[in-house]
């Protein structure tokens, strides 16, 4: 009798994806973040589902319903903080996953890469809409500021913003539709993840050396299932430490004040994982220019396969590119810091310089260094 694992129409798909999948023998811990992102997505969908059972998407009761979840629902505080901090863990894993892809040249699988960038956009949209739902001060003003950016689009901008708002300001209609979109998007993300994996399994995984590893493959199970379980345990440990010891560490105190359209908070800023993009947006004095720079700060990832000039795939054996990569990482940390600072000297100029450097490294410096390293290969 043949093994059901290899013959059953459904089980054989799982088998080819997670059990008998040929995997490179030398992939490091940087390859763990894909599975960690999968776990983050599952945690977010489950905690979100239980929160949705008790949440009401109405401007009069939204803030109170979140308070009710934390005070009266069994382990509601745990579910709420796991969901809020789960988003932070999600973005930490996302940034590390993208950084791994850039460092080791995984973007040369351009279908997988481009689906990944679309996934990044979808997760960012979901997180933004989720931040609006508790209907605190930062929820309301964040929604107002970010949706207002669309008014910079020539001719249709104002109409578009009012259409998204469902009125002339962020109000009940906006909250209701944001809740609906926030609920449906994670399932769309799950479908995109399956497409992401489909394209990845067409080519097989990359590895740290960037070389073809067809001659040296090992089965995914048990080697990488065990490795992934270790990563998952560490992720859950980090998440639960954050949730149980310092649940509000990454949040904004202003969001514990109910939304008030008549009172603007002194510093409107998004959650920490959007601060780098927010800093790029603010560094340009022109509204439309800022919006374009904001969109390009993420869309630029799609250009990496075109901008790859090196004869080597990975940065493993390219010390000059490595150096530039880590300068880019430091620049992103700088932008994140600037995004959380008030708009005044010296933060304005630092933000502008960091934004210019961000685009310069990606569009000019890295490709030029790659061409120089190609020359060094001949010496």
Curated annotation (Swiss-Prot):
Disulfide bonds: none
Matches recorded under PROSITE patterns: CYTB_CTER, CYTB_NTER
Recorded superkingdom: Eukaryota
Cofactors: heme b
Primary location recorded for the protein, binned into one broad class: mitochondrion
Family: Belongs to the cytochrome b family.
PANTHER family: CYTOCHROME B
Function: Component of the ubiquinol-cytochrome c reductase complex (complex III or cytochrome b-c1 complex) that is part of the mitochondrial respiratory chain. The b-c1 complex mediates electron transfer from ubiquinol to cytochrome c. Contributes to the generation of a proton gradient across the mitochondrial membrane that is then used for ATP synthesis.
Protein name from the UniProt record: Cytochrome b
Organism: Tamias obscurus
High-level lineage: Eukaryota, Metazoa, Chordata, Craniata, Vertebrata
């Amino acid at each position: 009798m043949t093994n059901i694992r290899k013959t059953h129409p459904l089980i054989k798909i799982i088998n080819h994806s997670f059990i008998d999948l040929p995997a490179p023998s030398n992939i490091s811990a940087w390859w763990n973040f894909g599975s960690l992102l999968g776990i983050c997505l599952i945690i977010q969908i489950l905690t979100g589902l239980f929160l949705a059972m008790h949440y009401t998407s109405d401007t009069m009761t939204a803030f109170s319903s979140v308070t009710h979840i934390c005070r009266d629902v069994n382990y509601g505080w745990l579910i709420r903080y796991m969901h809020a901090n789960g988003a932070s863990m999600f973005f930490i894993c996302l940034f590390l996953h993208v950084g791994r892809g850039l460092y080791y040249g995984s973007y040369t699988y351009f279908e997988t890469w481009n689906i990944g960038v679309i996934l990044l956009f979808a997760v960012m949209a979901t997180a933004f809409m989720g931040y609006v739902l508790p209907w605190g001060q930062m929820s309301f003003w964040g929604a107002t500021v970010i949706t207002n950016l669309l008014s910079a689009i020539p001719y249709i901008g104002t109409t578009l913003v009012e259409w998204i708002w469902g009125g002339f300001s962020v109000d009940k209609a906006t909250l209701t539709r944001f809740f609906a979109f926030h609920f449906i998007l994670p399932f769309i993300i799950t479908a995109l993840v399956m497409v992401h994996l489909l394209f990845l399994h067409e080519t097989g995984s990359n590895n740290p050396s960037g070389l073809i590893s067809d001659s040296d493959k090992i089965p995914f199970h048990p080697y990488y299932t065990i490795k992934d379980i270790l990563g998952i345990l560490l992720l859950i440990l980090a998440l639960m430490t954050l949730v149980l010891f310092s649940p509000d560490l990454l949040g904004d105190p202003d969001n514990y004040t109910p939304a008030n359209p008549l009172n603007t908070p002194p510093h409107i800023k998004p959650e920490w994982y959007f601060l780098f993009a927010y800093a790029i947006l603010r560094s340009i004095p022109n509204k439309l220019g800022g919006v374009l720079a904001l969109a390009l700060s993420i869309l630029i990832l799609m250009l990496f396969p075109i901008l790859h000039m090196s004869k080597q795939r990975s940065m493993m054996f390219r010390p000059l590119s490595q150096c530039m990569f880590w300068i880019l990482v430091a620049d992103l940390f700088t932008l994140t810091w600037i995004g959380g600072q008030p708009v005044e000297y010296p933060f304005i100029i630092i933000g502008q310089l960091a934004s210019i450097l961000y685009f310069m490294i990606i569009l000019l410096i890295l490709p030029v260094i790659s061409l120089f390293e190609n020359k060094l290969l001949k010496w």
